[in-house]
């Protein structure tokens, strides 16, 4: 869990608090698993509140990437954009109108009429809204995990001199590892490996799947990184370039020395979610 505040400029984001709490129940009935999530979130909020960190603001939570469908539509000249977005949501999700939740926004691409549509099962959103409410959080935004991670790593890049040119981002998650090559406003997915094939990562790195980059940012839970039988240092050795583990400890809108907080890379998803919250 990450709590951020924003003062003025986009870059002036302050980390008010960070907290981790194990869920403690990975299997079992769905109701029991979500009850465990609610207890863990409430415990994290309680500790942050005891440290005088306000947690009663609006919240953002994530969906797994495979729980959300997205599409880009060119609707230039059409006046029925909301209806067209809903129809697209039904089409790409295959869900009934009363069982989905969707949103759309202007894409900001080359064509002025392009919109981006995101859709997910309504039940998944309702679960998260309920869990957040039990912890006293008003959930107002749902985002995708990989989108949140990419947002966090691109924000971190502004504090690294080696990231002024092309750089890469690696995210280790339960499903495996994802990699992007980033240059300017462009972020291109270049690597997707399943967690069931850990031996494929060293080979992909040696083949320069990330391309020529000045540095690589790494995010993800230490358990997920260890599953690939590697480490941040080993990734740097294979690539022969600087590797930066995500660490937002102490960020106050200004570059600062990395604190080397244990588990720092695991906060990338939470930070990216909170970043969207303060920006919106």
Give the location of each predicted region.
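Hydrophobic/aromatic-enriched cytosolic interaction surfaces used to assemble or bind macromolecules
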Residues: 1-280
């Amino acid at each position: 869990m990450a709590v951020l505040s924003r003062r003025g400029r986009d870059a002036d984001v302050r980390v008010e608090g960070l907290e981790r709490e194990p869920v403690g129940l990975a299997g079992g009935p769905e109701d029991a698993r979500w009850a465990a999530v609610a207890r863990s979130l409430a415990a994290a909020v309680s500790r942050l509140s005891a440290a005088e960190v306000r947690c009663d603001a609006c919240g953002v939570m994530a969906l797994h990437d495979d729980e959300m469908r997205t599409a880009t539509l060119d609707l230039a000249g059409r006046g029925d954009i909301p209806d067209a977005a809903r129809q697209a949501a039904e089409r790409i999700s295959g869900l009934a109108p009363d069982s989905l939740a969707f949103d759309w926004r202007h894409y900001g691409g080359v064509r002025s009429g392009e919109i981006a549509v995101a859709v997910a099962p309504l039940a998944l959103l309702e679960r998260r809204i309920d869990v957040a409410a039990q912890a006293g959080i008003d959930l107002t935004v749902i985002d995708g995990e990989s989108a949140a991670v990419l947002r966090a790593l691109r924000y971190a890049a502004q504090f690294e001199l080696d990231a002024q040119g092309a750089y890469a981002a690696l995210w280790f998650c339960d499903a495996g590892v994802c990699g992007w090559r980033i240059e300017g406003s462009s972020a291109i997915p270049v690597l997707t490996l399943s967690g069931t094939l850990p031996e494929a990562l060293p080979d992909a790195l040696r083949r320069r799947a990330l391309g020529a980059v000045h540095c690589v940012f790494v995010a993800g839970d230490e358990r997920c990184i260890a599953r690939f039988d590697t480490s941040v240092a080993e990734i740097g050795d294979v690539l022969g370039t600087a590797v930066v583990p995500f660490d937002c400890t102490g960020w106050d809108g200004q570059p600062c020395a990395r604190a080397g907080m244990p588990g720092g890379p695991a906060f990338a998803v939470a930070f990216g979610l909170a970043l969207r919250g303060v920006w919106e």
